[in-house]
Amino acid sequence: MTTLETLKWDGKKAGKVSIDLKVAKETSSADLIHRAVLRQLANKRQGTASTLTRSEVRGGGRKPYKQKGTGRARQGSIRTPLRPGGGVIFGPKPRSYNLDMNRKERRLALRTALMSRISDFKTVEDFGSTLDQPKTSEIINGLSRLGIEKTEKVLVILDNPSDVIKKSINNLEKVKLIAADQLNVFDILNANKLVIGQSAINKIQEVYAS
């Protein structure tokens, strides 16, 4: 069990909260997280790249010139891959890049990745009530009060983010908002700092504890 210091949105200390998640063994954690990230990135690929082979390119049915007597290399079609406008040899065709990983492994990888970033956590009291209308500057100032630089990539994890918070964060290039029950390994590892709402900690333990 790890105890985290909770801060108010103004940066002052507010108390403490505990988080206890089962993680992978140190000997296998790196491989597990690596496979989880590969799966996530592979499954995002559309796999729609497609080229035409020699037989699929339009035209080229007639032999361009006679076989012998021209002094040139023999050609059977103007759509040969050797000529501009011809077919493509071993080009890509639509395919699925999806990788499989069972649910227990995915959950274990996520918990391990999350707990490995514990030193980069900024646990805050839920600050949705402090914003009555979308205001990007308030998010910027709030992150600054938490000791986060403007150049750092930030992942904000909240239990049930309101539309006001979503709109306030939407314009910030280096800040990403995600719900506590929709976490993924890549975003956790890609961020420099993780700002987690106090109720999100409870939600994470409820959803990902097993």
Curated annotation (Swiss-Prot):
Organism: Prochlorococcus marinus subsp. pastoris (strain CCMP1986 / NIES-2087 / MED4)
UniProt biased composition (Polar residues): 44-54
Keywords of this entry: Ribonucleoprotein, Ribosomal protein, RNA-binding, rRNA-binding
Keyword flag DNA-binding: no
Record-given protein name: Large ribosomal subunit protein uL4
Family the UniProt entry places it in: Belongs to the universal ribosomal protein uL4 family.
Region (Disordered): 44-94
Job description of the protein: One of the primary rRNA binding proteins, this protein initially binds near the 5'-end of the 23S rRNA. It is important during the early stages of 50S assembly. It makes multiple contacts with different domains of the 23S rRNA in the assembled 50S subunit and ribosome. Forms part of the polypeptide exit tunnel.
GO molecular function ontology, one term from the record: rRNA binding
Pfam families: Ribosomal_L4 (PF00573)
